Amino acid sequence: MYVSDLALTDFRSYADLVIGLEPGITAFVGPNGQGKTNLVEAIGYLGTFSSHRVSGDAALVRWGAERAVVRAKVVRRARPTLVELEIVAGRANRARVDRSPVSRVREAAGIARSVIFAPEDLALVKGDPDGRRRFLDDLLVQLSPRLAGVRSEYERVLRQRTALLKSAGPARRRSGDGEPAALRTLDVWDGHLARAGAELVAARVRLVQDLRPHVGATYEQVSAAQSEARISYRASVEEARPDDAPTEVVESVETELTRADLVEARLLEAMARLRTREIERGVSLVGPHRDDLVLTLADMPAKGYASHGESWSYALALRLASYALLRDDGEAGGGGEPVLVLDDVFAELDARRRTRLASIVASAEQVLVTAAVAEDVPEELEGARMDVMGGEVLRVR
C-alpha cells in the first residue's frame, strides 16, 4: 500500500497544499519548524484518527480556520481509494471514502495504514503507562476499525462514572443513613463500563500475544544483543483481586483475559469491592484506563534498567513489530503493507542503530523520511527528495 496523493486544507501550517508521492523512499528535508512533520502527521492521522504529537485535535486546525481537511489517495493492490477526513475542534470528525460520506467515521479507519517512528517514541519505554496504552489502542484501531467505537464508548462511560463518583461522596454524607440516588445510578454505569472495558482489555491482550514474537525478533535485529525483549499485559482487574485469591501462572491469566465475558465479570466484582474507596477518592480504580504494557529486557523492567541505547532499540522494536503485524494482516486481507514514516528519528540514533534500522526498512513499499539536513538520511534510504521551507514543498530529486 502507498499514498500517491496528499492534499491538506488548513491543516497545521498548511492553508492549501497538494503533493504527489510514489512508492519507495521519499525524504522531506528542511530546518525544524518548516512543516515537515505536519505532512507525515496528516498521513498518520488518517490511519488512527489521532496525532503522534498531541492528544487533542484543536492544534491540528490552522490558526484562524474553522476546520481542517486531510485528503489522501491510497493505492492498494493497484486499486486507488480516496479518503477524506474533516477535523473540527470540539466536534465529531466527518469522513468520506471515494467522495461518499460514511455514516461512522471509523469506517474510514484502517484504509490508510501507517507506522510512525518519532523521537517521542522513547517515552514508550521510559514514560508513563498512558503512552503505552495509546500505542496498543492506535494499533488496534488500524487492525480492527470497529474498536475505535469501543474505545470512544469506554472513554465516554468512564467520564460519566468518574463524575458520578465525585458527587457520590458528598451526597452520601448529606443523606445520612439513606442511599443517595447517585449510588443507585452507579450500578448502571458499572455495567456499561465493565462491558466496554472487557472488550477493550480482551482485544489488547490478544494484540500483545500477537506482537510478542515480533518484538523479540526485531529487538535482536536492531540491537544485535543477546538480551531477550519480552512484552506482557498488566491488567488492573487482576491486581484488584483479593489477597487470598489463588496465584496462577502468567500464561493462564493471560488466556483468561482474552475472554471478554470473564473480564466483564471480574470488572464488576472488582468495582463492587472497591466502591467505598472509589467514592472516597472520586476516581475509577479499575479498568483498561489503569492497565499497562509491561516491557522487560533480560527479565528486568526496561523502564529504569535499560540504558539509553537499549531503550531506543526497544522503542524501535515496538514500532517494527507493529509494522510486521500490519503487513502480515494486510497481505492476508488484501490491504498490503502500511506506510512507514521515520520522523526525524535518525538524528536521535547512534551510527550502528541508524544503519541497522535503515537496512531493515529500506525494502518497505513506501517509506517517508523527515530530516533537518540531507546528511541525516542514511545512504541506504536514498530516493526521492522534497525540500520543505516556509510551508512550501519543492521536489528536488
Swiss-Prot record:
Q: Name one GO cellular component term.
A: cytoplasm
Q: What is its main location?
A: cytoplasm
Gene3D superfamilies to which the protein is assigned, alphabetical: P-loop containing nucleotide triphosphate hydrolases, RecF/RecN/SMC, N-terminal domain
Q: Name one Pfam family in it.
A: SMC_N
The record's InterPro entries line, in alphabetical order, gives: DNA-binding_RecF (IPR001238), DNA-binding_RecF_CS (IPR018078), P-loop_NTPase (IPR027417), RecF/RecN/SMC_N (IPR003395), RecF_2 (IPR042174)
Q: List the molecular function annotations (GO) for this entry.
A: ATP binding; single-stranded DNA binding
UniProt-listed PROSITE patterns? RECF_1 (PS00617), RECF_2 (PS00618)
Q: Which GO terms describe its biological process?
A: DNA replication; DNA synthesis involved in DNA repair; double-strand break repair; SOS response
Location of this chain's protein in the cell: Cytoplasm
Sorted UniProt keywords:
ATP-binding, Cytoplasm, DNA damage, DNA repair, DNA replication, DNA-binding, Nucleotide-binding, SOS response
Residues holding ATP = 30-37
Function, in words = The RecF protein is involved in DNA metabolism; it is required for DNA replication and normal SOS inducibility. RecF binds preferentially to single-stranded, linear DNA. It also seems to bind ATP.
Cited NCBIfam families: recf
Q: Which family does it belong to?
A: Belongs to the RecF family.
- Name under which the protein is recorded: DNA replication and repair protein RecF
Q: Which gene encodes it?
A: recF
